[in-house]
């Protein structure tokens, strides 16, 4: 049976790992063992932070909606309840964008949500 030499595949593998570690600090960029660990950890961070990114944006949208709604005398929770009662099915991303860029349109949405609320609903102080 013929002898199998793996120098080419090993070199390609090392080149791929060191390419992924390009720009890292210290031995992480040029020592294969340390670079492999750094690249693996970077992948773990990337995977985790793709999930965290969704949470962060949702929190940002809620903060923006809450700020715009409080200026009109409602709280975020009461406003969202009013939207549900009014049958307005806009998601938080769209609501935050409207609140940021189209203030008059958002005031109209707030008015509809207020009108749909039952009498005596809590209003922001």
UniProtKB/Swiss-Prot annotation:
GO terms for molecular function: rRNA binding; structural constituent of ribosome. Keywords: Ribonucleoprotein, Ribosomal protein, RNA-binding, rRNA-binding. The keyword Ribosomal protein applies. It comes from the Bacteria. GO terms for biological process: ribosomal large subunit assembly; translation. GO terms for cellular component: ribonucleoprotein complex; ribosome. Pfam families: Ribosomal_L20. NCBIfam families: rplT_bact. Binds directly to 23S ribosomal RNA and is necessary for the in vitro assembly process of the 50S ribosomal subunit. It is not involved in the protein synthesizing functions of that subunit. Belongs to the bacterial ribosomal protein bL20 family. PANTHER family: 39S RIBOSOMAL PROTEIN L20. HAMAP family: Ribosomal_bL20. This is Large ribosomal subunit protein bL20. It comes from Rhizorhabdus wittichii (strain DSM 6014 / CCUG 31198 / JCM 15750 / NBRC 105917 / EY 4224 / RW1). The lineage of its organism: Bacteria, Pseudomonadati, Pseudomonadota, Alphaproteobacteria, Sphingomonadales.
């Amino acid at each position: 049976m013929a002898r199998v030499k793996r120098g080419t595949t090993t070199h390609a593998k090392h080149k791929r790992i060191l390419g992924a570690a390009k720009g890292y600090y210290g031995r992480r960029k040029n020592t294969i063992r340390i670079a492999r660990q750094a690249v693996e950890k970077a992948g773990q961070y990337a995977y985790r932070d793709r999930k965290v990114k969704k949470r962060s944006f949702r929190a940002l949208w809620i903060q923006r909606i809450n700020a715009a709604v409080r200026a009109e005398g409602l709280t975020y929770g009461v406003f969202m309840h009013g939207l549900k009662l009014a049958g307005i099915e806009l998601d938080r991303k769209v609501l935050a964008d409207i609140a940021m860029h189209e203030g008059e349109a958002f005031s109209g949405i707030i008015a509809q949500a207020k009108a749909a609320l039952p009498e005596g609903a809590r209003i922001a102080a």
